[in-house]
UniProtKB/Swiss-Prot annotation:
GO CC annotations on file: nucleus
Compositionally skewed regions (Low complexity) per UniProt: 124-148, 300-311, 322-336
Origin organism lineage: Eukaryota, Metazoa, Chordata, Craniata, Vertebrata
Pfam family name, one: LIM
Chain's role: Plays an essential role in the regulation of neuronal differentiation and migration during development of the central nervous system.
Domain LIM zinc-binding: 3-61, 62-125
Name of the protein: LIM/homeobox protein Lhx5
Keywords linked to the UniProt accession: DNA-binding, Homeobox, LIM domain, Metal-binding, Nucleus, Repeat, Transcription, Transcription regulation, Zinc
Organism: Rattus norvegicus (Rat)
SUPFAM superfamilies associated with the record: Glucocorticoid receptor-like (DNA-binding domain) (SSF57716), Homeodomain-like (SSF46689)
Gene designation per UniProt: Lhx5
Length: 402
């Protein structure tokens, strides 16, 4: 039975053969698929193909974070954070100096580095340029900075002083050996206008839009991403402040007058806007609402009177007032020298007067009636009324008016 080669699929007629991956091979067919080098001691395979050690690690091994090429197991590397670099790729992005072990450096975008000397020199140059800013605010932006940018030219002095303080703080941190921020990126006026226009169109741009902005402005994509994050944060904060101001204006616009708990009501609040007046300290003769009948303090009449043929006249002496509409008289405290009712017509043939208005009594002189003046009933010296509700003395008689 003939044995066929796994590489060329031809029958193996040679005296010697190689067994690779449990299959028979010609000696000349066991070679690297990349460099065509014959493999005699050791080989690597992937997807049925054979590779030498260098080509296998170059293609499928760990990639260098600087050049994105594979790292051979024999190569010397440097490691920063979680990234691995070739020795030639681990250089300063400003002066291209190769960084050595133990040297202080500043990491930018995870795969770029700046040596300490270049970083300190750029910080001093930036501070000098910030002192000369006069027209527009080109505030520096750090990739780790999360505060929103100040876009108003009126705030140039504030942004300049804040940048000075930041630079001083960073220098102090460098002297103390603590963790420091990366270098700050200055955004120019034209770049800022481009970013503002892009933010007005799309507040949250996609990666493709950020790449286009990076090409237009020359800024790093990380810087652009952080600028948009800060600008969105500023917009949200401005909306919150405006909403809070609107609620506060609505609350204080029309304050209500509030009465303290347990406070007493005013007489004006109790009476409201009623058309009737209220006299609290009126000391003279007054009339108040009463019933449809009156009580008179008098002696025994000369003859029996009936409500139909009796008429009463109000006195016209000093201090007395004719009765008004819907105001029957109310008894009050009167002395014997000021009688309220002095005359009463008691002639049986005298007709009773017809009222002009309903509920109104008109004073009339006693001489009008044919019977002449009747003898008056004397008023009692002390009032026959016991209270403000006009209750008669039980010794007096009662006569109804209407």
């Amino acid at each position: 039975m003939m044995v066929h080669c796994a590489g060329c699929e031809r029958p193996i007629l040679d005296r010697f053969l190689l067994n690779v991956l449990d299959r028979a091979w010609h000696i000349k067919c066991v070679q690297c698929c990349e460099c065509k080098t014959n493999l005699s001691e050791k080989c690597f395979s992937r997807e049925g193909k054979l590779y030498c050690k260098n080509d296998f690690f170059r293609r499928f091994g760990t990639k260098c974070a600087g050049c994105a090429q594979g790292i051979s197991p024999s190569d010397l590397v440097r490691k920063a954070r979680s990234k691995v670099f070739h020795l030639n790729c681990f250089t300063c992005m400003v002066c291209n100096k190769q960084l050595s072990t133990g040297e202080e450096l500043y990491v930018i975008d995870e795969n770029k580095f700046v040596c300490k000397d270049d970083y300190l020199s750029s910080s001093s140059l930036k501070e000098g340029s910030l002192n000369s800013v006069s027209s527009c605010t080109d505030r520096s932006l750090s990739p780790d900075l999360q505060d929103p940018l100040q876009d108003d030219p009126k705030e140039t002095d504030n942004s300049t002083s804040s940048d000075k303080e930041t630079a001083n703080n960073e220098n102090e941190e460098q002297n103390s050996g603590t963790k420091r921020r990366g270098p700050r990126t200055t955004i120019k006026a034209k770049q800022l206008e481009t970013l503002k226009a892009a933010f007005a169109a799309t507040p949250k741009p996609t990666r493709h839009i950020r790449e286009q902005l990076a090409q237009e402005t020359g800024l790093n994509m990380r810087v652009i991403q952080v600028w948009f994050q800060n600008r969105r944060s500023k917009e949200r904060r401005m909306k919150q402040l405006s909403a809070l101001g609107a609620r506060r204006h609505a609350f204080f616009r029309s304050p209500r007058r509030m009465r303290p708990l347990g406070g007493r009501l005013d007489e004006s609040e109790m009476l409201g806007s009623t058309p009737y007046t209220y006299y609290g300290d009126y000391q003279s003769d007054y009339y108040a609402p009463g019933g449809n009948y009156d009580f008179f303090a008098h002696g025994p009449p000369s003859q029996a009177q009936s409500p139909a043929d009796s008429s009463f006249l109000a006195a016209s002496g000093p201090g007395s007032t004719p009765l008004g509409a819907l105001e029957p008289p109310l008894a009050g405290p009167h002395g014997a020298d000021n009688p309220r009712f002095t005359d009463m017509i008691s002639h049986p043939d005298t007709p009773s007067p017809e009222p002009g208005l309903p509920g109104a009594l008109h004073p009339m002189p006693g001489e009008v009636f044919s019977g002449g003046p009747s003898p008056p009933f004397p008023m009692s010296g002390t009032s026959g009324y016991s209270g403000p509700l006009s209750h008669p003395n039980p010794e007096l008689n009662e006569a109804a008016v209407w």
